[in-house]
Design a protein with these regions (language model features):
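Short, conserved phosphate/pyrophosphate- and ester-handling motifs at nucleotide-, phospho-/glycolipid
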Residues: 59, 273, 357
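Cytochrome P450 heme-thiolate "Cys pocket" and heme-binding signature region
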Residues: 92-93, 267-268, 272, 309-310, ...
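Cytochrome P450 catalytic-core helices
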Residues: 276-295, 299-301, 411-426
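Cytochrome P450 I-helix active-site segment
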Residues: 7-20, 124-128, 179-185, 239-247, ...
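Conserved cytochrome P450 K-helix/beta-meander segment immediately N-terminal to the heme-binding cysteine loop
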Residues: 362-389
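Cytochrome P450 heme-thiolate monooxygenase catalytic core
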Residues: 1-10, 74-85, 103, 119-279, ...
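N-terminal membrane-proximal hinge/A-helix region immediately C-terminal to the signal-anchor transmembrane segment
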Residues: 1-89, 102, 106, 121-122, ...
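Cytochrome P450 proximal C-terminal region
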Residues: 2-6, 10, 37-38, 131, ...
Length: 459
């Protein structure tokens, strides 16, 4: 194996190969990380400077050590926030995604009530209302045009659901303005956008031109203006808040929360609902369309359950096959495809020394394809999550993270995914437009290089 040395010395990527790998990480990080793992193994160091260590790990045992066993030593850290290639820190601020230590503990304690069973179930009427609107729209559309751009529709619907359930169900939001600013901000933070910026800056520098990338700031300014207006209205009690904004207002009145805190949590919730859940639903619907036998089996599962328990609401039913499908979708296309941590103190992982201040990178995309745990890891196979097959793979599967900092909104996301996928399947048969497997991009979220389009046939 290239770069292999003493088993307890972390393989170091040769200096002459660093530029190639660095460009690869900016241009196509999923492919680049996979290639480096093939060459250097499950742990290796991309050392860009004398005192810097960017250590990639790709084994469940190492991941468990970082995210659970010694998680106190591995926080996001200032270095991770400041060097984030996606520039998320100015977007998400110090909200639940980016905070650390005692600050994170306090936020988690404040927000976890939003994800209790009671709180989650209280969002059902709004989920059903927005889903009903989408189904009605599609039912009319498919009469003349059966092709639907699923991703955009899911993004719009999830944004509506989030704003109504977590901000207010009384406001008439300017959904288009919020949607355009969010999509623009996310795209401007993509690795491809950053690569284009770096290339242009490098080209113009010899001409004495100091090129600065400002497009993301324009979108962020729009989002900040929207957030500021919403926060002002909340504090002045101009509308009845729901979910997140209700608990933030209560905390604000106790002088425990600032305007900035409310703004940051708003951005965190919008991002999570807007992109991660919507994208996960998109890929789930794609897999149903791409594998018609599985779609038929899931439909039969739904029909049988409804027939046996006609008085039980669909949100309270168990659908084992659908759950296998969703889990396999999240394995292949984990919305958050990488995690970064900073080692506060020096440590040892399976005998490998980890210097203090090292940046640790975990790619869930690569981990979910580790050949030791996922044979034929690029192939779609819902049997991967049958009880016997999944045994011992807890830390080989981390679409929501793992350990103490596992995504606080996991239960809500899974609840929304099941209800929405079930609702769509009851009304439409799904078919792919092309038999070719979609190519993917790792921006902030894993998406297709082209929009995911499906053919819908009304049942």
């Amino acid at each position: 194996m290239e770069g292999a040395v003493d088993s307890k010395t972390i393989p170091l990527i040769p200096g002459h190969k660093i530029p190639v790998h660095a460009v690869g990480l900016l241009n196509n990080p999923l492919k680049a990380i996979s290639k480096m793992i093939d060459s250097y193994g499950d742990i290796f160091n991309l050392k860009l400077a004398k005192d810097s260590n960017i250590i990639f790990v790709n084994h469940p045992d190492y991941v468990k050590h970082i995210l659970k066993d010694n998680q106190a030593n591995y926080s996001r850290g200032n270095a991770v926030k400041q060097s984030s290639i996606t520039g998320l820190h100015d977007f998400l601020g110090n909200g639940i995604f980016m905070s650390d230590d005692e600050d994170w503990e306090a936020q988690h304690k404040l927000l976890k009530g939003l994800f209790s069973v009671t709180a989650i179930e209280s969002t059902l009427p709004i989920i059903e209302d927005e889903l009903g609107k989408l189904i009605a729209k599609w039912s009319h559309q498919v009469i003349n045009n059966p092709t639907v751009e699923v991703e955009e529709e899911m993004l719009l619907m999830m944004m509506h659901i989030m704003l109504r359930t977590q901000v207010s169900n009384e406001l008439n939001f300017d959904y288009n303005a919020i949607f355009n600013a969010l999509t623009g901000r996310v795209e401007a933070s993509s690795v491809k956008a950053l690569f284009r910026y770096q290339l242009k800056a490098f080209t113009l520098k010899p001409l004495g031109i100091n090129y600065k990338y400002t497009k993301h700031q324009e979108y962020l300014d729009t989002l900040n203006a929207i957030a500021d207006k919403l926060v002002s209205g909340l504090i002045n009690e101009e509308y009845k808040p729901s979910g997140l904004f209700a608990i933030m207002l209560a905390d604000y009145k106790l002088n425990k929360t600032t305007r900035t805190d409310i703004r940051d949590q708003f951005m965190n919730f919008v991002f999570a609902a807007f992109d991660t859940t919507a994208t996960a639903i998109t890929w789930t619907l794609y897999h149903l369309a791409a594998y018609p036998k599985i779609q038929q089996q899931v439909n039969e599962e739904l029909a049988t359950s409804i027939q046996k328990e006609p008085d039980t609401h669909i949100s309270n039913r168990q659908f084992p096959l659908l759950q296998l499908l969703i889990k396999e979708t999240l394995r292949l296309y984990p919305p958050v495809w990488s995690y970064a941590r900073e080692a506060a103190e020096s440590d040892t992982i399976n005998g490998y020394p980890i210097p203090a201040k090292s940046i640790i990178v975990i790619s869930s995309y690569a981990l979910h394809r580790h050949p030791e745990f996922w044979p034929s890891g690029d192939n779609f196979n819902i049997a991967n999550f049958e009880k016997e097959n999944f045994k011992g793979k807890t830390f080989a599967y981390i679409p929501f993270g793992q350990g103490k900092r596992m995504c606080v909104g996991r239960a809500l996301a899974e609840y929304q995914m099941q209800i929405i996928v079930e609702g769509i399947l009851q009304q439409f048969h799904l078919e792919t437009i092309s038999k070719k497997k979609p190519e993917i991009n790792a921006n902030i979220i894993i998406k297709g290089t082209e929009p995911v389009r499906l053919k819908l046939v009304k049942r």
